[in-house]
């Protein structure tokens, strides 16, 4: 049997399923091959951040995901004497969602899988293992071992989302440089949470590091450092497990333990994320220690970055060179997340008493410095995506006399556009992305965008699935809606967040990509020229009918 698809995804984990949902939205014919017979039923990740929740919103599944989360989950880092070294408790909503959330991964994965039922052109096939590939100028043909025999499926592109042991990466012969730490971790999940408090604790105990987290639906997780010489078999040794839990609960023997697993701490990044018609995403491209909670979220960032680009290429709207920007944009941020994860792992798993004593003293100093303490509490140490190259058009600060000299003005190109609550055209309070749509957006403050965008550029934007957005103070919403040109979305800034955001910058027009990254910023009068520059760097290939 032979078949033809636009995209083959290997691996039905969270990254593969998220990417499949994104491609499904774009109408891209996709097949997901998963060697296992069903979704993995044990949670690897336990933290989902605001960026990932925004992605769940993008694919229309956030309402299915939220019931399985603990929003605004505070982390307390303590030493061996239970003294608090630091608190991490970000409470802002820059992107519309809580910034730290506990979650049950298998239930979220299930929501992602069920979401694909919306798309008849997307297929998920379990018990199907890709055994070999053949590539030519027309695409990639995969030989697939299925429960009913061998099949051959051809696609324009293959995305390996098949985990840290990725067969796709191995097929490409790519190095997976980095390190595997000598210490491992033992995960113990318990039903009927015996503690019940909503926060998480990271214990930097030199005798044995640990973490404990409240998870949804009455589940409690513990993670303990295992030392060299302690084998994987200790996970099944009740006496050993109870000895670990004895300092944490009144009676370990009465716990309802539902899961125990040993895992290794890896920190590795693939040599390349793209080789011709093959791409890697998620753990196939990078792995990191679990302590920072960014492995799962980094994979979701990969899917969001890659999805719109793959769709544009296979649908003939952009050159295949657009796919080169995936690695250009994602690699440095991934490396920063790996470094953060390693540093946090070293912080809480170090069992050298001299170093941990120095750590405790340093934490006491930070606690006495308001700015440093606030930065830690607000999670200011977390690297945010910032693309200096790729599908972005940097701009210089304007020098026109009507604009004050603002050398310290925030620069936004390559960073995520915020998502406040706004009023949509019906006057309802909604998140910005729901009011504007999820594709390309040209957002202009207090100005009709059609006055500054030519018909040719507007048609090109529309064929890319983009929209023009007129943002106004909420008081002006009825008037702006009545005066809006056909196709222009009008949003009312009910909270003042958008007005304040534009006020901090000497630009009034913003071009936002489908992954919510700002591609360009400019003055309204410059918009048409800058928009066409964005089309150029995005390798847009079709010409509008009015050209």
Segments from the language model and where they lie:
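Glycine-rich FAD pyrophosphate-binding loop
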Residues: 24-44
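Active-site-adjacent segment of FAD-dependent monooxygenases/related oxidoreductases
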Residues: 41-44, 48-115, 215
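N-terminal Rossmann-fold NAD(P) dinucleotide-binding loop
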Residues: 16-17
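Core beta-strand elements of the Rossmann-like FAD/NAD(P) dinucleotide-binding domain
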Residues: 3-5, 148-157
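Helical substrate-recognition/capping region of FAD-dependent monooxygenase/halogenase enzymes
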Residues: 2-6, 10, 25-26, 82, ...
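FAD/FMN-dependent oxidoreductases across multiple families
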Residues: 235-298, 318, 323, 340, ...
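A conserved short coil-to-beta-strand element within the FAD-binding core of flavoproteins
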Residues: 126-140
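Conserved FAD-binding catalytic core of PHBH/FMO-like flavoproteins
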Residues: 113-114, 119, 128, 157, ...
């Amino acid at each position: 049997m032979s078949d033809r698809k636009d995209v083959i995804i290997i691996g039905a984990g969270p990254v593969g399923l998220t990417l499949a949902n994104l491609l499904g939205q774009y109408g891209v014919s996709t097949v997901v091959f998963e060697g296992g017979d069903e979704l993995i039923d044990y949670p690897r990740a336990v933290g989902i951040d605001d960026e990932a929740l925004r992605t769940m919103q993008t694919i229309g599944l956030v309402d299915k995901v939220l019931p399985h989360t603990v929003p605004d989950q505070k982390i307390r880092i303590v030493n061996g004497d239970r003294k608090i070294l630091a608190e991490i408790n970000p409470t802002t909503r820059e992107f519309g969602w809580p910034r730290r959330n506990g979650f049950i991964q298998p239930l979220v994965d299930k929501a992602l899988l069920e979401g694909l039922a919306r798309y008849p052109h997307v297929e998920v096939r379990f018990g199907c293992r890709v055994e070999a590939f053949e590539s030519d100028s027309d695409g990639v043909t995969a030989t697939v071992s299925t429960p009913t025999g061998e099949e051959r499926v051809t696609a324009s592109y293959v995305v390996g989302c098949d985990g840290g042991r990725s067969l796709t990466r191995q097929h490409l012969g790519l190095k997976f440089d980095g390190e595997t730490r000598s210490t491992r971790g033992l995960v113990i999940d318990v039903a009927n949470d015996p503690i019940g408090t909503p926060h998480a604790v990271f214990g930097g105990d030199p005798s044995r590091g640990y973490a404990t987290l409240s998870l949804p639906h009455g589940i409690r997780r513990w993670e303990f450092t295992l030392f060299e010489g302690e084998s994987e078999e200790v996970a099944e040794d009740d006496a050993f497990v109870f000895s670990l839990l004895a300092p944490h609960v009144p009676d370990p023997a009465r716990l309802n333990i539902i899961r125990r697993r040993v895992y290794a701490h890896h920190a590795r990044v693939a040599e390349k994320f793209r080789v011709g018609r093959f791409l890697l995403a998620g753990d196939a491209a990078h792995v990191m220690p679990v302590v920072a909670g960014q492995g799962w979220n980094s994979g979701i960032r990969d899917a969001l970055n890659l999805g719109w680009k793959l769709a544009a290429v296979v649908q003939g709207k952009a050159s295949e060179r657009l796919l080169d920007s995936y690695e250009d944009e994602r690699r440095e941020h991934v490396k920063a997340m790996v470094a953060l994860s390693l540093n946090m792992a070293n912080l809480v798993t170090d069992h050298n008493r001299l170093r941990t004593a120095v750590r405790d003293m340093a934490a006491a100093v930070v606690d006495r410095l308001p700015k440093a303490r606030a930065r830690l509490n607000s999670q200011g140490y977390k690297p945010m995506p910032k693309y200096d190259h790729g599908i972005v058009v940097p701009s210089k600060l304007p020098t026109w006399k009507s604009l004050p000299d603002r050398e310290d003005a925030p620069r936004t190109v390559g960073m995520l556009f915020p998502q406040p609550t706004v009023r949509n055209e019906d006057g309802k309070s909604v998140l910005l992305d729901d009011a504007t749509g999820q594709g390309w957006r040209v957002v202009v403050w207090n100005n009709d965008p059609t006055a500054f965008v030519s018909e040719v550029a507007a048609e090109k934007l529309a064929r890319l699935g983009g929209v023009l957005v007129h943002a106004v103070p909420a008081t002006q919403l009825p008037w702006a809606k009545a005066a809006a040109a056909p196709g222009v979305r009008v949003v009312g800034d009910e909270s003042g967040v958008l007005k304040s955001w534009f006020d901090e910058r000497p630009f009034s027009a913003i071009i936002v990509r489908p992954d919510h990254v700002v591609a360009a910023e400019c003055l309204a009068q410059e918009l048409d020229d800058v928009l066409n520059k964005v089309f150029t760097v995005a390798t847009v290939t079709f010409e509008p009918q009015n050209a």
